[in-house]
Amino acid sequence: MTPVEEIIKKDIFRETPLRYLGYANEVGEAFRSLVKPVVVKFSYVVAFGYVAADSIDKGLQEYIKTHSTSTEKTKKVAIAAVDTVLWQTFASVLIPGFTINRFCFFSNLLLQKSTKLPTNMRKWTVTCLGLATIPFIVHPIDSFVEEAMDKTARKIYNEPTISNKE
């Protein structure tokens, strides 16, 4: 495979730094104590925009493939898009958002009870801890969601793991 073919085959939404756009809401959650609620809400808009872009991309990739019937094509496009919406919603938004939110909440609680840090310093410490946590949760959550979907939703529509398809 040539370098150009490798680049074309690479999933830009899951195998490049663009993947971190799906984690915009985690950044928002980490900054929750320092910013207005509208900023946190906007971070969710960015994350769901990423989910939508990846889902459209996966649907279009399936659409341009050759299928034996239009019914099969419609089914395959729908499955590709829905599978991506489910995967990205859980792996990029819901689970990591909850994880960072709770991590920051309990970090703040711990710092309040165990230190005498000024409020502003405590908030910045919690934010930094939340941001530092993000890179460590990406791959475990991605793997968990992949496995969970293989055991649940993908059995319903009888499709192999999307990332393992050719």
UniProtKB/Swiss-Prot annotation:
Topology term for the membrane: Multi-pass membrane protein
Superkingdom in the source lineage: Eukaryota
GO terms under biological process: apoptotic process; mitochondrial fission
UniProt keywords, alphabetically: Apoptosis, Membrane, Mitochondrion, Mitochondrion inner membrane, Transmembrane, Transmembrane helix
GO CC field: mitochondrial inner membrane; mitochondrion
Record-linked InterPro entries: Mitochondrial_18_kDa_protein (IPR019560)
Transmembrane regions: 33-53, 78-98, 125-145
Subcellular location: Mitochondrion inner membrane
Protein task: Involved in the mitochondrial division probably by regulating membrane fission. Loss-of-function leads to apoptosis.
Family: Belongs to the MTFP1 family.
PANTHER family in the record: MITOCHONDRIAL FISSION PROCESS PROTEIN 1
Protein name (Swiss-Prot/TrEMBL): Mitochondrial fission process protein 1
Organism annotation: Caenorhabditis elegans
Gene: mtp-18
